[in-house]
Amino acid sequence: MKKLTYLFLTILIIACSDDEGNPCVYSPTLVTDAATNVTETTAALNGVINIVSENCDNPNNTEQGFVYATNTQPTTANNKVNVNGTDINTTLENLEPNTTYYTRTFLTNVFGEFY
């Protein structure tokens, strides 16, 4: 009976230990360059998405690229163009003439939405 009690207590202590290891640190850096080759209806976009991830699994279902809108802080609820990679670029077409657009790089995954 003593051995059984000892075994039970050992299992209980191990099961209740607070050993969660190192915490996940997920820190993306996003850069949006000024638009180039701007015409009345097109604009070339360039940016950089650099992900620093320590002790985290790489998330699935990641979306990244550019968002754009006529408001100063576009989000994924506005227009978006998905572009994969670290150094990213695309050309927006069919823009409204004589309209100012604002752009940002974006990254969305289980860790959140980043701009």
Which stretches of residues belong to each language-model region?
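Short, surface-exposed linear motifs at loops/turns and structural transition points
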Residues: 16-115
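Sec-dependent N-terminal signal peptides
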Residues: 4-14
